[in-house]
Amino acid sequence: MRLAITMGVAITLVLVSPAEALSPALTPELRMSVMDKEQKVEFAIAQLVTDKKQRLCAKRIAYKESRYNETSLNKKSGARGVWQLLWGKPHWSVLKQTQEAHKYVLHRYDTWCEAYRFHQERNWY
């Protein structure tokens, strides 16, 4: 079932069933709209990381940093989002946040598991 409601000029609301949301024909953002916080993070990681062990390391960092909360804000440092990025923007989706975190992790640590090892030692990454 698909229902599109247009309000005014710029807002379009599309409702899809959970089964439709898993269809590869839909954009990742639309598919994520029916997922809970943890599922969104898992889905975003899976778009970028193929290795199961690396995905698990990434997921562990996300949980420790924000409990999968995409709107999390550290008032002391200004870091925000699932990954607590210092350069994160409040309007970024979980997918965008994860893309940015992935670039950072590959640049700084080479792998998510190396980043997680560092995180375990220092409680930041």
Enumerate the language-model features and the residues they cover:
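N-terminal prepro-regions of secreted/extracellular proteins
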Residues: 1-36
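Peptidoglycan cell-wall recognition and remodeling modules
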Residues: 37-125
